[in-house]
Amino acid sequence: MNFLRKIVKNCRDEDTQKPSLVSAPPDDDDLWLPPPEYVPLKELTGKKNMRNFCINGEVKVCSPNGYSFRILRHILRSFDEIYSGNHRMIGLVKVVIGLALSGAPVPEGMNWVYKLRRTLIFQWADSRGPLEGEELEYSQEITWDDDTEFIGLQIRVSARQCHIQGRIWRINMNSRACQLWSDMSLQTQRSEEDKDSSLLLE
């Protein structure tokens, strides 16, 4: 076990804050769903509380013995309780995490790194969401550990409001991203103006 601890220490950043611990996952395994499918949409008509953000997101999974999405999903189910960032932008962070983890990881030593760099359009309901011009620099490490397995999850999200306009897509409701958003209890409501889009409630 001491040997495992030494290995784990090498795949953590030295400057990260004290990680948050989560409890053990259930025994049942998850069902693998197909990767996200994106369908082109026309321009959104509702412009209320809509903002473009240039996103730089990264989720780094550190585990000497590999990992399963069952445990990642279990960790993310506790996200509301362990999130340490700006709570006006927790919905944005959840969206980025789900999209990043629905992509393909890049191996980096004993880590697997999921990255997302793109411009995303967000719409918040009512007066929710970040203040005008507000930016986000969020970084947190979350760990899951027992006698047989260790997983460290390093999450970094940078979000800056921008005026870059990209294509608009609709994500398949059976995608892994939607599965992860459900695990994180992402709060949304369907837009009354655009039936294929949702408004963030957090």
Swiss-Prot record:
The extra comment attached to this record reads: Most abundant protein in the virion.
The organism of origin for this protein: Rabies virus (strain India) (RABV)
Gene3D superfamilies, per database record: Rhabdovirus matrix protein M2
Query: Gene Ontology terms, cellular component aspect?
Result: host cell cytoplasm; host cell endomembrane system; membrane; viral envelope; virion membrane
Marked site, Involved in the inhibition of stress granules formation and contributes therefore to virulence, at: V95
The GO molecular function terms of this record are: structural constituent of virion
Q: How does it assemble?
A: Homomultimer. Interacts with nucleoprotein and with the cytoplasmic domain of glycoprotein. Interacts with host ATP6V1A; this interaction plays an important role in virion uncoating after viral entry.
Tell me which UniProt keywords the record has, alphabetically.
Host cytoplasm, Host membrane, Host-virus interaction, Membrane, Phosphoprotein, Viral budding, Viral budding via the host ESCRT complexes, Viral envelope protein, Viral matrix protein, Viral release from host cell, Virion
Q: Does the keyword Membrane apply?
A: yes
Quote any Pfam family the record assigns.
Answer: Rhabdo_M2
**Region Essential for glycoprotein binding, residue ranges:** 115-151
Q: What is this protein called?
A: Matrix protein
* Gene Ontology biological-process annotations: viral budding via host ESCRT complex
